[in-house]
């Protein structure tokens, strides 16, 4: 019986959701704190799993350790700690580990189910132009890290077992490691999907990841949603959604505004006039998801699971909220959600 709370520290919101989804989908009470300040209220609900958005992905390497330290100071000591990192090693990984006390870390950023593996210390596979050196991303902390080959989910489970045997007191990884741990905690091989109810949907795309851009193009081709461009977060038109699927996409306009500013600008434009009327709100990109939910005065959510791999789902005041990391999914991922919302596919 697993009795100690698992705490996941993620550098952005979609990461916090994605890493927590395997636990929620297996029936564990899973709370998401959208900020460090929301940890206290989430702890009062006594979840089995608490996933915290540090909001440190887009800040500098000097600020990232401060967010980590603030989160750790708000948490009880008797926890299992999981440092969620991007499977493509984005963000301030070494800086965040600077503020994380540990003796030995199991570092396993692979997501084998997505074709993204670790071999001889390098992340390779889907979404990568070249292998990425895991030890380099860890900096000085690589000296206290185990970086096993993980070419399959079975490898990931074996790596988790090895980490426990040798006394690793910090788990560092992404969805693949979370899947292995969720299976270990529950004994359930697969998570149950959580699906949105049919109804009008608003897709808000802030991510510029090539994987997401391909999904947007496929959605526009196959579904033909009402499309509204938002150059640097400024909507070309703002109106109550009138179609079954409305797609808002932040696009470049020649200026190099910071991603957080673009996301805040986008959120301020659409909340509440465009978000309130829809049954399903899909947010793509961690900064975008965080900004929109903050504008909606949402600080904490209970995660129910995923509707598709990498797409965490929760309900807030009866509205379905789906968040998607930029680097997840197939070209048809957004189309699948659109068809569910349109009542065409269950």
Residue ranges and their predicted role:
Residues 26-49, 232-243, 303-318:
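N-terminal short beta-loop-beta anion/metal-coordinating cradle
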Residues 278, 289-336:
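Conserved, well-ordered active-site substructure
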Residues 2-7, 25-33, 37, 46-49, ...:
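Cap/lid and interdomain-hinge subdomains that line or gate substrate/regulatory clefts
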Residues 193-271:
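Redox- and metal-dependent alpha/beta enzyme cores, enriched for Fe-S-associated oxidoreductases
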Residues 115, 176-180, 187-199, 306-327:
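Short, flexible loop segments at boundaries between secondary-structure elements
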Residues 252-282, 286-304:
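Catalytic cores of soluble, metal-dependent hydrolases
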Residues 31-43, 156-162, 188, 231-240, ...:
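A short, acidic, amphipathic alpha-helical segment used as a generic capping/interface helix at domain edges
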Residues 12-15, 85-94, 112-113, 152-154, ...:
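Gly/Ser/Thr-rich loops at beta-strand to alpha-helix junctions
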């Amino acid at each position: 019986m697993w009795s100690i709370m698992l705490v996941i520290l993620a550098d952005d919101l979609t990461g916090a959701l994605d890493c927590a989804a395997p636990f929620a989908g297996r029936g564990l009470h899973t709370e998401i704190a959208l900020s460090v300040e929301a940890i206290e209220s989430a702890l009062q609900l006594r979840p089995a799993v608490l996933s915290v958005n540090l909001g440190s992905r887009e800040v500098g390497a000097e600020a990232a350790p401060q967010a980590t330290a603030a989160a750790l100071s708000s948490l009880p000591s008797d926890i299992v700690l999981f440092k969620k990192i991007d499977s493509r090693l984005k963000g301030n990984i070494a800086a965040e580990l600077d503020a994380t006390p540990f003796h030995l870390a199991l570092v396993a950023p692979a997501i084998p189910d997505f074709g993204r593996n670790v071999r001889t210390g390098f992340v390779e596979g889907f979404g990568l132009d070249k292998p990425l050196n895991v030890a380099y991303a860890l900096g000085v902390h690589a000296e206290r890290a185990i970086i096993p080959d993980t070419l399959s989910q079975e490898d990931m489970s074996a790596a988790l077992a090895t980490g426990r045997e040798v006394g690793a007191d910090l788990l560092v990884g992404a969805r693949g490691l979370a899947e292995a741990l969720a299976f270990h905690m529950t004994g359930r091989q697969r998570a149950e999907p959580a699906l949105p109810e049919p109804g009008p949907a608003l897709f808000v795309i802030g991510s510029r990841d090539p994987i997401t851009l391909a999904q947007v193009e496929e959605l526009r081709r196959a579904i033909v949603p009402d499309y509204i461009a938002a150059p640097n977060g400024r909507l070309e038109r703002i109106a109550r959604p009138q179609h079954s699927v409305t797609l808002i996409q932040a696009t470049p306009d020649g200026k190099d505004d910071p991603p957080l500013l673009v996301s805040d600008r986008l959120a301020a434009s659409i909340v509440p006039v465009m978000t309130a009327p829809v049954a399903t709100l899909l947010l793509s990109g961690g900064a975008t998801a965080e900004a929109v939910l903050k504008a909606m005065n949402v600080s904490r959510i209970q995660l129910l699971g995923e509707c598709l791999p990498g797409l965490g789902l929760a309900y807030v005041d009866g509205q379905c909220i789906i968040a998607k990391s930029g680097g997840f999914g197939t070209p048809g991922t957004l189309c699948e959600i659109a068809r569910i919302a349109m009542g065409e596919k269950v």
